[in-house]
């Protein structure tokens, strides 16, 4: 085993340099790699090769959807919740996009992408009169029908810390349970300024894995490139 990971990483980096030389156009080339925090050998390999941690995602699991807590708090006056229909799609998409406006490491998500992957059976929203102020977008895993996913939980900036997120999350989890899910999972960034962990843990989620993203610059530049899944070596 010793030396195989280093050899594979060196080969992958050299291959990327060749591709950049042939096709690259940018001036700030970087190589990216992934490793779980529990994979100590892969992490040590990347750090020794001058990769630096840039961000990470944590996987959380709720083991039993039959054991959901009671709401524990009421919604603010004027706020109501309900399912998301097709006529609400654009407002739901905009609510999510706007909630990420001040964050880094987010991919562009067009409205057409939203529509193409829409699966609203377990989607819930909150409104203040006619204005949508938050969404919980949950779904059943396609090939694991007993596992639910919390794909997005977003509340508009001016409506946070009012208990709306917790109510939406519990509504979404109950919808998953009604659709046959027995457990639920979600991913969230560790550099989250809104203390989302406290909310997720308050309804029963527990940390499972942390997936760390590493990057390092190339010696010369032409684009953003990625070595994927180094932890599988």
Residue spans for each PLM region:
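A conserved beta-turn-beta hairpin within the catalytic core of GNAT-like acetyltransferases
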Residues: 1, 27, 141-150, 160, ...
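Conserved active-site tyrosine of GNAT-family acetyltransferases
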Residues: 42, 46, 200, 205
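Short glycine/proline-centered loop/turn elements that form peptide/ligand docking sites
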Residues: 169, 192-196, 213-218
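Conserved hydrophobic beta-strand within the GNAT/NAT acetyltransferase core sheet
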Residues: 31-33, 150, 184-188
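Conserved acetyl-CoA-binding loop-helix of GNAT-fold acetyltransferases
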Residues: 2-18, 155, 161-178, 183, ...
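A short beta-loop-alpha structural element at the N-terminal edge
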Residues: 80-92, 233
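A conserved beta-strand-loop-helix scaffold within acyl/acetyltransferase catalytic domains
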Residues: 101-155
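Acyl-donor-binding surface of acyltransferase catalytic domains
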Residues: 1-76, 210-216
């Amino acid at each position: 085993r010793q030396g195989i990971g280093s050899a594979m990483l060196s080969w992958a980096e050299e291959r990327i340099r060749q591709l950049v030389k042939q096709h690259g156009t940018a001036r700030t080339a970087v190589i990216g790699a992934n490793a779980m925090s529990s994979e100590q050998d892969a992490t040590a390999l990347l750090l020794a090769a001058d990769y630096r941690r840039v961000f990470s995602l944590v996987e959380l699991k709720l083991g039993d959807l039959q054991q959901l807590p009671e709401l524990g708090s009421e919604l603010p006056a004027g706020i109501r919740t309900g399912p998301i229909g097709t006529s609400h799609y654009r407002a739901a998409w905009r609510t999510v996009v706007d909630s990420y406006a001040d964050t880094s490491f987010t991919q562009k998500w067009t409205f057409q992408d939203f529509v193409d992957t829409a699966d609203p059976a377990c989607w819930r929203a909150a409104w203040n009169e006619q204005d949508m102020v938050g969404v919980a977008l949950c779904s059943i895993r396609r090939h694991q029908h007993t596992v639910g996913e919390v794909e997005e939980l977003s509340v508009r900036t001016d409506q946070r810390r009012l208990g709306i997120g917790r109510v939406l999350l519990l509504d979404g989890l109950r919808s998953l349970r009604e659709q046959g899910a027995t457990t639920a999972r979600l991913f969230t960034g560790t550099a989250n300024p809104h203390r989302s962990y406290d909310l997720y843990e308050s309804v029963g989620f527990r940390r499972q894995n942390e997936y760390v993203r590493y990057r390092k610059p190339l010696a010369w530049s032409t684009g953003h490139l990625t070595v994927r899944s180094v932890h599988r070596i």
